[in-house]
Regions:
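Short beta-strand His + acidic residue motifs that chelate non-heme Fe in jelly-roll/DSBH
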Residues: 43, 62-63, 79, 85-91
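Conserved short histidine dyad/triad with adjacent acidic residue
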Residues: 31-46
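Compact, glycine-rich, soluble single-domain proteins
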Residues: 17, 47-49
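Ligand-binding loop in jelly-roll beta-barrel domains
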Residues: 82-105
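Short acidic-glycine-tyrosine-enriched beta hairpin
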Residues: 67-81
């Protein structure tokens, strides 16, 4: 059984969002996203996969479809398959969040 301590994998890149794979199977993946201030994940979509964003630390503007909301620690949302989605760290603090996706694209 694979066990991951999140504190051991949080890593930032001053140039762009840092994404680290935590779990990756044929059907599912979970990544940790680490964003410095002003970094973002561009808005995009996955035709057949649902994606969940879960904020661990900091806050960020999350876009799903035509909605944009600020999510903070312990808040989450889902981007259903085919919906545009993305995130931007609009604050002066670091943002750490999980991204879950299934089925894997």
């Amino acid at each position: 059984m694979k066990v991951v301590k999140l504190a051991d994998v949080v890593e930032f890149n001053p140039e762009k969002l840092k994404k680290v794979s935590l779990f990756d199977t044929d059907n599912f993946f979970c990544d940790i996203y680490c964003l410095e201030p002003a970094q973002s994940q561009k808005v995009h979509s996955h035709g057949d996969s649902d994606k969940v964003y879960y904020v661990l630390k900091g806050s960020g503007k999350v876009t799903v479809g035509s909605d944009e909301k600020v999510l903070g620690p312990d808040e989450n949302t889902i981007a259903p398959a085919g919906e545009d989605h993305g995130v931007v760290n609009h604050t002066q603090n670091k943002l750490v969040m999980l991204g879950f996706m299934a089925p894997k694209p």
